[in-house]
Amino acid sequence: KNGVDLIFIDSCHEAQHVQKLMSYYFAYLKQDGAIFVDDIDSLPSRLKKNIWNSIVYDLTLDSVKEFYYNNTENCSLKVFYNHEANGLAMIYKKSKFGTQPNKVNKIWNYNIFLKVLYPYLRRLSRLFKQIKK
């Protein structure tokens, strides 16, 4: 009836599930309230070479960012990192209690192949510039 100040999501760690929870509960959050999402940083898992948790935590952070990117007028996003923990994201609500979030649409992103290829292309470009001199 009056809304809540804080929502903490530490669920099954499936990106779509986390996004669904944020979308559902956002309207119940008071203005200046926050949704916290646990386990969004893969570094501790990557250091342990735990591929499954690394992927899951990265995808969870991606889903939190997608929610934010589709709702920038309603909220802000802060991400907290600690190399000994799995990170925490905070969605801070700027809009009034009862405000429904926008539907989350996929935001364009570059191809992961280009992310891997880019550093090599930069090196080649520098090499060609040096050869040209």
Question: Residues of each region from the PLM?
Answer:
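C-terminal substrate-binding/active-site "lid" region of AdoMet-derived donor-dependent transferases
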Residues: 15-132
